[in-house]
Amino acid sequence: MATYAVGDLQGCLQPLKCLLDRVSFNPAVDRLWLVGDLVNRGPESLETLRFLYSIRHSLVCVLGNHDLHLLAAWHNVERLKKSDTLREIIEAPDADQLFDWLRQQKLLHYDEPRGIALVHAGIPPQWTLGKALELAAEVEEVLRDDTRLQLYLDGMYGNEPNKWSKNLAGVERLRVITNYFTRMRFCTADGKLDLKSKEGLGSAPKGYKAWYAHKDRRSRHVKIIFGHWAALQGEVTEPDVIALDTGCVWGGAMTLYNVDSGEYHRCDCADDGTLRQPAQPTTLNDHT
């Protein structure tokens, strides 16, 4: 039995299958961890969701911002933007089945025996792992609650409040929790978010750092696997922080990581999110 984690899919199914073939993935015995952003912008968002649903018993999945955007568009199609490739999912005959599965997924997963956390964007430096799991559960509970889901999805969008406070309540509380787990890149040591800067580390505003780089980050004892930040190209110097979004949908690569051995496997992608031909997966050592 092997456990793998894969970077942002964003509807790029061919590279995912290329990587799974490369490691002879067997859904009957192996496990696949997904860092979120399963859909959007790539060429096969519907097919990707259907494939994942077909192997759902082999998956651990956390939600990304594009997945939450899909759920919001499912409830209000006017949320769709011109750049989205989500309409085919909303109009699919099996849409309800796929959405019901999607909203059961987590914002943060922790594998206690391995001491590894899986999250889309990150864990803010001021939270312990325990606090992060507690607050993630608040949003996960709402996602699964038919009576509260619509209110959450309608109020999810926005950059404010940009910092956690235990005094926050209602939609504002859920929004800032969501932004930490699904949109964060740069923040201050006390967790004030900058959600405008999306490039590499050199684009950090004054006083801000990558969320994982703060020396007093309270989750340093935990290995964290995350996606979301394609501009990093998987290059993180912090020990026990694994960045897996290598920009497949932008013509980069899709990255698969063996959680136990530390091996990386990459499959190059074309500009449209399909396989770059000829497909030549590569295998790399840990932290390359």
Swiss-Prot record:
<comment type="function">
    <text>Hydrolyzes diadenosine 5',5'''-P1,P4-tetraphosphate to yield ADP.</text>
</comment>
<dbReference type="GO" id="GO:0008803">
    <property type="term" value="F:bis(5'-nucleosyl)-tetraphosphatase (symmetrical) activity"/>
</dbReference>
<dbReference type="Pfam" id="PF00149">
    <property type="entry name" value="Metallophos"/>
</dbReference>
<dbReference type="InterPro" id="IPR004617">
    <property type="entry name" value="ApaH"/>
</dbReference>
<dbReference type="InterPro" id="IPR004843">
    <property type="entry name" value="Calcineurin-like_PHP_ApaH"/>
</dbReference>
<dbReference type="InterPro" id="IPR029052">
    <property type="entry name" value="Metallo-depent_PP-like"/>
</dbReference>
<keyword id="KW-0378">Hydrolase</keyword>
<comment type="similarity">
    <text>Belongs to the Ap4A hydrolase family.</text>
</comment>
<protein>
    <recommendedName>
        <fullName>Bis(5'-nucleosyl)-tetraphosphatase, symmetrical</fullName>
        <ecNumber>3.6.1.41</ecNumber>
    </recommendedName>
</protein>
